[in-house]
């Protein structure tokens, strides 16, 4: 009998072990769909991005016009651009839900998988930031100026570092050129990191909503979860297409329809919605270095999740107190997102400061305390 090609061919064997015959817990819910959705987001972004790069010119005098040209004169250029810009928003929606799922169900206890995931988040944030600068509108220019300027808060080497990043004494042509190069490179880095992420995941197998070993009850990935994933793709593409076709500029900033002008500062500089929570934390501290440290800590705190887990149970499925805390954290992040979009004035300043304090208190102090308390309650 001839050997099964799918199981013996060096390349097909890898595909088979990770997409077809992969043993998967039978009880994983729709919250486990976001990994594959992130994969499809990445593929969509790389394809649309490649098509956009073919018509883009990374030069300060031509960048804005080249984007306008793509939308006006290139076949379906407007659609490709709208899909790429809004695809980024859906990418972040998926990654935030994916992280939330990992947090709720204790998936962070797979330390290597979790850590590579946090590195992926940081790389995605960097990619989105440099990408936002490319259309060279007002918000692109001033966003780049404000965020890169934060590096100057680093003692001793800060100013040198900023000028090195800019390629001059202000955000100008060299900055745009290198940001384009980085924006082209980073998605492929994300793809590589994704393979590492999956390699670590397949060492342990997926977690499940009960947080207990599921070795005794696993089913093949295909056809069960491959079908479920395709349904997920459809549910993702429907709102993406709706947004791109009906209201493509809903999530953008109107300032970006004005070409970059170093002499005119927009009244309110703010990043895209997916960075607003971190921006609110940055602004809540009235000191430059302190703000930068808080901004960095707001994301890097995720690395500490495995060490702050005190509960005897892995998931929050049967931990009502932790659940209450988790949903308070979600509400808190929504408040931070709202505050980030508001001007720096009363009462937004104090709300932002309280929300920032609450964010770190919940993650670093309350979660471990409540986990320990729930362990004690188990004894009654």
UniProtKB/Swiss-Prot annotation:
PANTHER family, per the entry: CYTOCHROME B
Pfam families reported for this sequence: Cytochrom_B_C, Cytochrome_B
Subcellular location: Mitochondrion inner membrane
Protein name: Cytochrome b
Protein task: Component of the ubiquinol-cytochrome c reductase complex (complex III or cytochrome b-c1 complex) that is part of the mitochondrial respiratory chain. The b-c1 complex mediates electron transfer from ubiquinol to cytochrome c. Contributes to the generation of a proton gradient across the mitochondrial membrane that is then used for ATP synthesis.
Organism encoding this protein: Contopus virens
Lineage of source species: Eukaryota, Metazoa, Chordata, Craniata, Vertebrata
Subunit structure, as described in the record: The cytochrome bc1 complex contains 11 subunits: 3 respiratory subunits (MT-CYB, CYC1 and UQCRFS1), 2 core proteins (UQCRC1 and UQCRC2) and 6 low-molecular weight proteins (UQCRH/QCR6, UQCRB/QCR7, UQCRQ/QCR8, UQCR10/QCR9, UQCR11/QCR10 and a cleavage product of UQCRFS1). This cytochrome bc1 complex then forms a dimer.
Annotated cofactor note: Binds 2 heme b groups non-covalently.
């Amino acid at each position: 009998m001839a050997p099964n090609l799918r199981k013996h061919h060096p390349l097909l064997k890898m595909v088979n072990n990770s997409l077809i015959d992969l043993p998967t817990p039978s009880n994983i819910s729709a919250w486990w769909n976001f990994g594959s959705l992130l994969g499809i987001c990445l593929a969509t972004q790389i394809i649309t991005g490649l098509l956009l790069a073919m018509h883009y010119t990374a030069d300060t005098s031509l960048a804005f016009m080249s984007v306008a040209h793509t939308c006006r004169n290139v076949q379906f250029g407007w659609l490709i651009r709208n899909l790429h810009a809004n695809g980024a928003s859906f990418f972040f929606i998926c990654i935030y839900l994916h992280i939330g799922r990992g947090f709720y169900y204790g998936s962070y206890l797979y330390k290597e998988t979790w850590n590579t995931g946090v590195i992926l988040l940081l790389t995605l944030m960097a990619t989105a930031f440099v990408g936002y600068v490319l259309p060279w509108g007002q918000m692109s220019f001033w966003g780049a100026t404000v965020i890169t300027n934060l590096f100057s808060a680093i003692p001793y080497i800060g100013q040198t570092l900023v000028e090195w990043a800019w390629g001059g004494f202000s955000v100008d042509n060299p900055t745009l050129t290198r940001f384009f190069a980085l924006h082209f490179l980073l998605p492929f880095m994300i793809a590589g990191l994704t393979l590492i992420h999956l390699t670590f995941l397949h060492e342990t197998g997926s977690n499940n909503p009960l947080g207990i070993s599921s070795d005794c009850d696993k089913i093949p990935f295909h056809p069960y979860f491959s079908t479920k994933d395709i349904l997920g793709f459809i549910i993702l593409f429907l709102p993406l297409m709706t947004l791109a076709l009906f209201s493509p500029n809903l999530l953008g900033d109107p300032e970006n329809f004005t070409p970059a002008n170093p002499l005119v500062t927009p009244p309110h500089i703010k990043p895209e919605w997916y960075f607003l929570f971190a921006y609110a934390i940055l602004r809540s501290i009235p000191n430059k270095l302190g703000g930068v440290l808080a901004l960095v800590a707001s994301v890097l705190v995720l690395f500490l999740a495995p060490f702050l887990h005190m509960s005897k149970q892995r998931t929050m499925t049967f931990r009502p107190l932790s659940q209450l805390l988790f949903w308070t954290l979600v509400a808190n992040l929504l408040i931070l997102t709202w505050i980030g979009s508001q001007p720096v004035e009363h009462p937004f300043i104090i709300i932002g400061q309280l929300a920032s304090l609450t964010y770190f208190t919940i993650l670093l102090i309350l979660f471990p305390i409540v986990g320990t308390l729930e362990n004690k309650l188990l004894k009654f």
